[in-house]
Structures are given as structure tokens and as C-alpha cells.
Amino acid sequence: MSTRKSPFFKKAEISLASPKAIEIWTERYFPNGQPINEVTSSETVNYKTLKPEPHGLFCQTIFGPVVDFTCACGKKATKLVKNKKFRGYCPKCGVERTSSRVRRYRLGLIKLKQPVAHSLYVSHRPSPLRLCLGWSTKRLQAVLKAVEFCYLPLIFTTFQSERECFSFFPKSFLLLRSQLTQKNEVFLEPRSSGFNENLSSSFFFKEKKRSKRKTGKVFPLRTSPRLFHKKHQKNRPRLVFNHGVIEARLYGIAYDATWPKVEEFQEFLFYLWEQSFFYESSIPYYAFAKGVKSYKEEIPKREQSYALQTGGLALQQILSHHDSSRFEYDLIYLSKKVSMILEILKENMASLNLDYEDDQKEYKKLLSKVKKLDLLLLKWKRQRELYRDFEVGKTQPAWMILNNLPVLPPGLRPITSIGGLVVASDINSFYRKIIIRNKRMSPRNNLGIFDTTLGGSWLSWCYNLRQVQEAVDELLRTGSVDAGRPLKSLLDGLKGKKGRFRQHLLGKRVDYSGRSVIVVGPKLKLHQCGLPKEMAVELFQPFIIQQLRLQGIVFTVTAAKVLIADRKPIVWSVLGEILKRHPVLLNRAPTLHRLGIQAFLPRLVEGKAILLHPLVCPAFNADFDGDQMAVHVPLSAKTRAEALSLLWSRNQLLAPSSGQPQHLPTQDMVLGFYYLTCSLEKTLKRVDSLVSSRKLFFQSSFFLKKKNEETLKNSIPQNLYFSEFSQVKTAYDIGNLTLHTPIWVKWTSCVQTFVPERHSRLKETLLETRLTFSGQRQTLFIDTCQFFSPSFFFGKKVRFIRTTPGRIFMHWCFFEANAEMSSTPTSKEKKSLEKK
């Protein structure tokens, strides 16, 4: 018995697809070799019978049968076909007898009569198309929408300088007469101009040796250059001067120059074709032309009779001659040059004296130049990264232009009838629009450049091209509105919470996991989370059963499950011991970075919500307005150790992207700290007024009355004097104090006083020293009071500080959190507070 192994994928890559690769995805053939992948009809199904129309968007011949092993004629695969050539295919309708599941992954193909640009590479910022061409966004959109056109030659050429052409060094080579007909392929320079082969000059050189003779003058040709090549055109004789050296009169037309109207280009050519004379100065930019290497192996060949091009075809012709590695090298060289210039400019700026008006003007000029060069360096950096991506991914820039449009399988864009109404996917409407508009594209008439009817036919043809480009944009990215209802594009169906990825492919259910709403848990520690009891029992049920059996409480799994179902108290105690050493993983979708999933030690809480510390919310990008989080339980000891070492929340203090602190107090925390520590007292301007605002101890009835030591211990101080923090907490819980009430508290350690700014130079400002009738010495400072026994120098020193209950509570939270503060007052304390 053989077992079938599932395919194993090491990695998956997303990159540009070549036109040839798109054809390979969709190519299928009849046994006689006829292709069956092209969708030529815009029809979908018959709305009466709901049967797919032939050659349409739901064609059974292209995408497979609707019913398993049944062709469009209704014949099943049990009836054998006598003709072995059509074994597996119906000889009448041509439908393959196979499973209907193939309709979920078989692709179709729409062959576009004119290439169109992929809208995602145009709309994205920065646009890869714009970076490759070096055009502005406005200009790129104008060419794509067929509002402007370019002059593109039938054969791209690049030019050498006169220095390279007329070099006399022995290593230099010159083009021989016999080599003129041979293909000499080089790469297109980043800023080289494109010329027609009949416009380009032809030079015939003989091999030269070192000699003292100089070249004479170069005379122009007496023939006019021609823009369009015709087969019946005869080659006119050419004049040869100066020992076989010849040079044609030539004005270059850049390949990236655009014209909005045909009439403007005709006017330009009218002056370009004007006869030139030998005494006019020649343009030193050109010498002789060479062929340019093209990356068109995987691009379908198209007949090009016009040098005027617009839309995707113009961009494809330009991009097909781009050499990514050469461009990247040139940009690196230019960036180094500009960096050196920037250093010189910055040195000049530093040497200027800004006290003088002339230097200020010069500084502004240099600053504007520096900003422009910085922007230029940024642009070149993006271009280098783009060309490097093309080179690493083994792709070509010309593949951003679509020659063939793949059609999604019918299973992903269904059409059905519900209650007598036909319901179809929005994608079908876009495909129908593309097919209809693509049929309108007709080949251009072979008109002369100065033909009077060229302008009108050109505008009509450009309008049809623009319609096809807009239809493809609606399918891929923008969508449209039909009868007041928005139609979703392919991008809309993929992105967002309701898209294909997040709604259907992601969010799978996993064992030992749960999901619930998160609420704030301010009493939790940073590494803790609150886990509902009911959820914890279900998640940790195997661990509870194991502990119950190990401790001898039960002996079978069934008995343990009964004990857990009854929610016995022993279950909660066992679960609490397990949770002390067993972390859980909390995850909030979407997990965009590694901090989106962290480990916590759970604590059992009542309710059905997960408690989360507020400081860990920024890492999850979570808030408490209904967000949900998933809980995952690491099962093995190895995974638990890995979770505590790598994912524990107390170790994720710094953001991995920037290194900045991740757990920062939020605005409500800062506001809470301020509210907790502020006082009701207003800022006093004079120090003398501070004495009257503080009651001294001899004014208090608490110190004037003689009481025994037990009464002093068990009674609450009157007139806002306290000897312990617990007494402050008790008075606050009863309601005798507020957070901002000024009080005096006994304190033996150091204290930070709130001294006004004008007294900050002094350590403490002494307000008054008093001596009572009983011999007790009292010293009053701004925020502290000191009392000494009658023995003066050898007596015990007692210090009281002036503070508020809010500051005491904050001190307890920071420094004495482990000490248990009494939450309920005793009966004697309640009586003494009620008397006040």
C-alpha cells in the first residue's frame, strides 16, 4: 500500500511575472494542438438555462466542466470515445471530461491588442514606473491616458562621442564597411536619445594607424532624413568625403520627449527637415550609431509601423532597453560625485559670516542648492533600490506593462441564481468591459506623418486605448460604480478585514487556544494577564487531569473530568498552582511585528474578559473599545522556556525598530499622577503668610490633653495630625479626608520639601522657633515641624511633615507596595473618626 506524500514548499516568492510566464500559466491545447486558453467573448452564462456560453468568461472548454466528468453535451465519461486522439475530450463540444474542481484553479487569458500599464505600479508612491523613466507623475499619467505621445524609433540607437570616434590609439576600433550590416548590441544609456535607423548617421572607417595627419572637415549629407521606413524606398547614393569618412547632418529627438498634439510634432519636423549647409556647426553629441540591446525575449512581438507611440506600448519599448545593473552602477557613481559637491557646499556655508548681508544672501543660495541636491540623492537612492530589486529578483522593468491579462477561475468569481434573481461577482463586469473595449482597438492606418487626416484618426485611436487602460485600472485597483452600487476591484477583494486573506485564509482555529474581549487591568503587573476561570479550565484541562492523578485525588481520566465539570474547589487550587509556572501567549491580529504576540503569566479572574496591563497595549496597537485577543497555551517544556526567554512581556521594553522605550505612561496616567499629588493650597507669595496657614502643635487639643499611652495608640489624631500611614488610609476610607487635604504625618526619614524658587538656594527656610510652658521646643519650617522633649539637647527628636493623602498613597504604591495596608478600620478607629 503506497502512501501519498503532500508537497513540501521551502519558500514562496511574490514577484513580477513576465508575459511569457502568464501564457504558460494558462496554456492548454487540444489533442490536435489547437490552443484553448483565450477568452474571446464577453458573454457569461445563458440567463434562462444558466449554462456557460462558449468562448465566454465561464466557458467549459476553457475552464473545465460544470458537472464532474460530464461535457457540455451532457455525455458522461463512461461512454468511451472511439477516436483515441480525442480520448478524454468530447469531439463535439471540446469539453474535457474531468472533475469540476478544475474550475477553481484553471486560468483564462485575454490577449490585449495594445499593452497597458499595471495600475498598482503607477499609483503606488513612489511609483516604480516613474522612477524607472525619470518622469513626473503628471507626464506619466498623460502618456498612459494617451493624451501625449512619444517619438520612438524602430531601432533604438546610442551614440559615441567624437573623442571616442576619432581616436588614434591602437586599442580603439573603428566600424568597418562590412560590419555595418551586422548586429552590434549594447545597452541603452540612462539619458541617451532614440533615433530612427534612417535618421541615424552611418560612418565608414578604415583601420587607422598612428600618424601625424589630421582629419579634415566633415560634410553633411545632401539627402533629407526620413522618419518612417518603407520597403519600396530606394537607398539613395551617399557622398563620401575626407578619405572615406562621412557624417550625416542629424538633430536628435529624445525618446522621453512628449507632444500633446500631432500638429505640434508636424511643425517640429517641418523645421527639422530643413536643408542644412556644410558651413553650419555640427552637433558634437553624436558620432556613429550602434544597436541597443533589448530584453524582448519574453515580450510578444508587435508590428510597429509608426514611430509615434503612446500608452503602455511606448513605456514598454523604453523599459525593454533598460539595463538594471548598468543603471545602478551609474547612479552609484553620480551619488558619490554629488556627495563630494555637498561637502564642498557645506564647507562654504560654514565659512560664511552671517553678520554681513552679502554673506546671508550667499548662505540662502547655497542652502537652496543643498536642499535640491539632497532631494536628488534621495531620488537616486530610491532608483538604486528599485534597480537592485529588479536584478536580485531576475525581473525586467518592462514586465510592469501587461500584454496579456489573466482571467480568474470561475470558482473565484461565481454567478448563480437565488430566488429567481441572478447574482454575479463584480469581477465579471470588469472582465466584460475589458473584452468589449479591447475589440474596439483597430490597427492604425498607415498614414504619412504630414497627412491631413492623421490628427483625427490619431485622436480616435487614442480614445479607444484610453478606454482599455481605464477598464484594466478598474479591474485591478480602483473599482467603479454601476447603477449607484460600488463594484469591488481585485484589490478591494483582497485587502481589509473582509478581504480574502483576513476573512478566509487567516484566522484559523487552533487547538489549546481561546479568544475573548480585552479589558484594562490596572492592578496587574507588567508580566501578568487576567484569564477568565471558565476559559482557563478548558485550556488547561489536560494539565489539571495530570496533577489530579499525580496527587492521588483521582485515578482515572473520567473521574478527573467529572471533578472538573462539577467545578470542585480542589480544581481551582490545582489550577492556581499550574498557572504560577505556566505562561500563555496573547496575540492580537494583525500581527505586523514580533511584539504582536507576547507571553504572560496568567491570573484567574471572574467574568469572561481577558485583563491586560495598559502599558503593553501600544505594542499590540490595542485599546479597550471592544478589541479581541487570542490566547495560546504552549504545551511542551521547551516551548514554555522559549516563551519566557523570547516573548515574555517584561523583556520587551524597547521597540525593535527604533530602540525607543515601548512602555511609556499614557496621558491618563500622567494626569492621574498630577491629580493624586496636587494640593488644595494656593501658592503663597510671602513667607510670613506660611506661618498662619500651618497649625502648630500647641494649638491642637490633641497635645494639650493628657492621655495615657494606650489612648494615644488606639485613638485617631485630631486636627489633621497622624502618626502612621495606616491612620491616613483609614480616615480616607471613612470619608473624613480627601486626596488633596493638607495633613501632618510623622516621618523619620529624609524628605524632599517644596520650596519656592526664590528660596531654592537655601536648604530649608526657618519660619519660627517656639518654647512651650512644659519646656518643649518647637521649630517650624515651610514643610516640616520638629519637636524636642524638655531635656533639649538629649531629648528625642520628632518630625512631622506636611503632605496630602494622595501623595502618601502614591508613595505607598512605589515604595511600600509589598506592605499590606489595612483596608478596613477597627471599631475603635471608626468611633474616634466619627466623633470628629
From Swiss-Prot:
It comes from the Eukaryota. Its cofactor is Mg(2+); Zn(2+). Binds 1 Mg(2+) ion per subunit. Binds 1 Zn(2+) ion per subunit. Zn(2+) binds at C71, C73, C90, C93. It is found in: Plastid, Chloroplast. Coiled coil: none annotated. It catalyses: RNA(n) + a ribonucleoside 5'-triphosphate = RNA(n+1) + diphosphate. The keyword Nucleotide-binding does not apply. One of its GO terms (cellular component) is chloroplast. Keywords: Chloroplast, DNA-directed RNA polymerase, Magnesium, Metal-binding, Nucleotidyltransferase, Plastid, Transcription, Transferase, Zinc. Its EC number is 2.7.7.6. PANTHER family: DNA-DIRECTED RNA POLYMERASE, DNA-DIRECTED RNA POLYMERASE SUBUNIT BETA. Belongs to the RNA polymerase beta' chain family. RpoC1 subfamily. DNA-dependent RNA polymerase catalyzes the transcription of DNA into RNA using the four ribonucleoside triphosphates as substrates. In plastids the minimal PEP RNA polymerase catalytic core is composed of four subunits: alpha, beta, beta', and beta''. When a (nuclear-encoded) sigma factor is associated with the core the holoenzyme is formed, which can initiate transcription. This is DNA-directed RNA polymerase subunit beta'. It comes from Chlorella vulgaris.
